[in-house]
From Swiss-Prot:
Deleted gene: phenotype: No effect on the response to the aversive chemical stimulus octanol or to volatile attractants. Behavioral adaptation to prolonged exposure to isoamyl alcohol or benzaldehyde is impaired. Recovery of chemotaxis from odorant-induced adaptation is impaired. Moderate reduction in chemotaxis towards volatile attractant diacetyl but not towards isoamyl alcohol and benzaldehyde. Slight defect in egg-laying. Increased lifespan and nuclear localization of daf-16. Reduced lifespan in a daf-16 (mu86) mutant background or in a mpz-1 RNAi-mediated knockdown background.
Subcellular location as annotated: Perikaryon; Cell projection, Dendrite
Position of sequence motif Clathrin box: 390-394
PROSITE patterns: ARRESTINS
Keywords: Cell projection, Sensory transduction
Name of the protein in its database record: Beta-arrestin arr-1
Record's comment describing the protein's domains: The [DE]-X(1,2)-F-X-X-[FL]-X-X-X-R motif mediates the interaction with the AP-2 complex subunit apb-1.
Taxon lineage: Eukaryota, Metazoa, Ecdysozoa, Nematoda, Chromadorea
Gene responsible for this protein: arr-1
Tissue-specific expression: Expressed in head neurons, nerve ring and ventral nerve cord (at protein level). Expressed in the nervous system including the nerve ring and the ventral and dorsal nerve cords. Highly expressed in amphid chemosensory neurons AWA, AWB, AWC, ADL and ASH, and in hermaphrodite specific neuron HSN. Also expressed in the intestine.
Biased composition, class Basic and acidic residues, residue ranges: 362-372
Amino acid sequence: MVDEDKKSGTRVFKKTSPNGKITTYLGKRDFIDRGDYVDLIDGMVLIDEEYIKDNRKVTAHLLAAFRYGREDLDVLGLTFRKDLISETFQVYPQTDKSISRPLSRLQERLKRKLGANAFPFWFEVAPKSASSVTLQPAPGDTGKPCGVDYELKTFVAVTDGSSGEKPKKSALSNTVRLAIRKLTYAPFESRPQPMVDVSKYFMMSSGLLHMEVSLDKEMYYHGESISVNVHIQNNSNKTVKKLKIYIIQVADICLFTTASYSCEVARIESNEGFPVGPGGTLSKVFAVCPLLSNNKDKRGLALDGQLKHEDTNLASSTILDSKTSKESLGIVVQYRVKVRAVLGPLNGELFAELPFTLTHSKPPESPERTDRGLPSIEATNGSEPVDIDLIQLHEELEPRYDDDLIFEDFARMRLHGNDSEDQPSPSANLPPSLL
């Protein structure tokens, strides 16, 4: 039945203020950073006729914030939050700029459907800016998790003439909060195949222990197995007993100083073909796949969303740009393959490390971007990933324009056993290690 609904109409997400006076409509909840541009954040706000007659001011506000401390510690004007992006748009009364700007296709359809009291808004986010990242709390932790997240808020301005103040309780009934996500897609680039050679010298041994490690490519998609090619040449008088391969996620917390947190997201140990004695060789390919389903209890793990949501993956690799400072990103995520050749307690280990990129498969081109005739993204490398990417980017786009609009509540699907109440953003609760 779900598939039939998707074929027969275009999904539109909506959320209404507690007093029912304003309703916000969005075509999708996830917006993709494609390297040269970010999907346009465009929607409509339906305003009650009473507010139209009273000429009440309605504003949309986009906020990307990095919460690195608990909200109950916010005292004396000192908050444990850093605002990375903050933009406002006056929805009503309309400005000359908003009146002259052409509507997107979805906005045109919503305007026809909702009537004259629906008004548009737009936000354009700079490419390679901060993306949504949540640091997973420990089991049993309460409150909101630490991380970088985006909030789209539409509200009716207070009438006491104050400005720049936090909305009063009386105004919260006139406010709609939507927790959206900005995700990263890394366009395919012809990059060299990752490879490293390492050697170890031993006392009382004339030869070296040599190990060569390589990956079949530099970029992988969520749910795709990583092929690790290992070649060992033992010219020493020592014996290699076994091999350990790890996938490590490194999250750099970029504040006043940079702190790094490492999480092991996949691991295999192999005794096949071992031991490799003096003069011996071993060549073998190992397949390892990092998945969130195997790491749900690890505190501090960086995710694309929140664990209680069904459509959440491990955080994608951050695409760094020489013109972008790490401090403006909040959290920088990277991945590495680490290989350890174990020789024994007295002889130590020989290890090698290779970085790689973990990202989403290529999403469809944004319809509005295509209409403007802007260049498309390079094709991917053609590799077919395993279908375990839980964030289905193609479902969030506007597929057709001759079908019906299907309105859905904005709240995301939750895993069984989690609270179904939609949580506002930005996130708040911080692992104690960051305090």
